Curated annotation (Swiss-Prot):
One of its GO terms (cellular component) is cytosol. This is Quinolinate synthase. NCBIfam families: nadA, PRK09375.1-1, PRK09375.1-2. Coiled coil: none annotated. GO terms for biological process: 'de novo' NAD biosynthetic process from L-aspartate. Its main location: cytoplasm. Pfam families: NadA. It is found in: Cytoplasm.
Length: 378
């Protein structure tokens, strides 16, 4: 059973002063600096992080140079929730989030007394854009008998309307547990991840019809052709991808689980169906192996993302240096919303602890080897 709610079009024109659509995001992507400029910017950022007593956390999907900076300065490169948890547990009172807005909000929810900065506050997420809190709340109100489960890729306001928040690495287990208890579910916002979980668990789920711009563009027919070209390659797929892509996967998993799979598999070649930003960490974790991007266009079709999130690409060295220099672009979450939004997050963390499952990994592959035991073939 699926929702009939029409999703918000995330490539629509957006008024000035609000989050930006796809075209506006690509227009705001910083130009690549020269080698000389890059070196100067990195040195400046390191000095500013020290001056501000700040720590940099970066998502796997941002550009490699930002991931390198986070690693080099004692920060963190990870999934969205681990970014927030790292910031919460770190001594620094200023956390700089290189990612998209919901990640900054989640960091603020877990660290309400810390200063959370972002290189560009317009950097958003198509899943967040496609699930406006007003429409979503009305949909939930129309189905009061259902437990509301939302994905991490949502605004603080949507999280505050939920009973549970989940990540891609634990969503399956939580929904299976709810289903075993006879609970009916509203799932938001990603329809592909929701459908994957629904098929695996048999749960009664109403699916909000959102999608990730990047993962929604992966093409099943073209992937099949690419697999024929590289028959020795293992296929790694994020579950936000369409069903005909997920069906061809050797492993379906979260970003960290896919990195772990690249390390643990004996294969020397991998086809990867997630954002290209992850390839930097995969190449570091599994040197000597080859990673091929899954196709996002075919049969004369074009792609809007071409396997790289335009909002993630808005994070650059220059605007990172600027936000540290000026102290602007601070994330604020209404305290009442933040307090309510923390409840579904804490519920997930308590479930993970009770089931001895790590919800997200830290990027430390030695520590996180057990994660891969929870990932099965599609």
């Amino acid at each position: 059973m699926q929702s009939t709610i029409k999703p918000v079009e995330y490539d629509r024109p957006v008024a000035a002063g609000t989050v930006c659509g796809v075209g506006q995001a690509w227009a705001k992507v910083p130009d690549a600096p020269s080698a000389e400029e890059r070196a100067a910017l990195k040195a400046r950022i390191k000095a500013l992080l020290a001056r501000e007593k700040a720590v940099l956390v970066a998502h796997y999907y941002v550009d490699a140079e930002l991931q390198e900076l986070a690693d080099e300065t004692g920060g963190c490169v990870a999934d969205s929730l681990e970014m927030a948890r790292f910031g919460r547990d770190h001594d620094a009172q200023t956390l700089v989030v290189a990612g998209v807005r919901f990640m900054g909000e989640t960091a603020k929810i877990l660290s309400p007394n810390k200063r959370i900065l972002m290189p560009d506050l317009d950097a958003t997420c198509s899943l967040d854009l496609g699930c406006p809190v007003g429409e979503f709340s009305a949909f939930c109100d129309a189905h009061p008998d259902r437990t509301v489960v939302v994905y991490a890729n949502t605004s603080a306001a949507v999280k505050a309307r939920a009973d549970w928040m989940v990540t891609s690495s634990i969503g399956l287990e939580i929904v299976a547990d709810l289903h075993a208890r006879g609970e009916k579910i509203i799932w938001a916002p990603d329809r592909h991840l929701g459908s994957y979980i629904q098929k695996k668990t048999g749960a009664d789920m109403l699916l909000w019809q959102g999608s990730c711009l990047v993962h929604d563009e992966f093409k099943g027919i073209e992937l099949d052709l690419l697999r024929a070209e590289y028959p020795d390659a293992k296929v790694l797929v994020h579950p936000e991808s369409p069903e005909n892509v997920v069906a061809q996967a050797d492993v379906v998993g979260s970003t960290t689980q896919l990195i772990d799979a690249a390390v643990k598999f004996d294969a020397k070649r991998f086809i990867v169906a997630t954002d290209l930003g992850i390839l930097h960490k995969m190449q570091l974790a599994a040197p000597g192996k080859t990673f091929i991007a899954a196709p996002t266009a075919g049969n004369s079709a074009t792609c809007k993302s071409c396997a790289h999130c335009p909002w993630m690409a808005m994070n650059g060295l220059a605007n990172l240096a600027d936000v540290l220099e000026r102290g602007h672009n601070e994330i604020f979450v209404d305290p009442a919303i933040g307090e309510r939004a923390r409840l579904p997050i804490d519920r997930m963390l308590e479930f993970a602890a009770a089931h001895k499952k790590r919800v997200q990994a830290s990027g430390d592959l030695q520590r996180d080897q057990s994660l891969f035991a929870n990932v099965g073939a599609a």
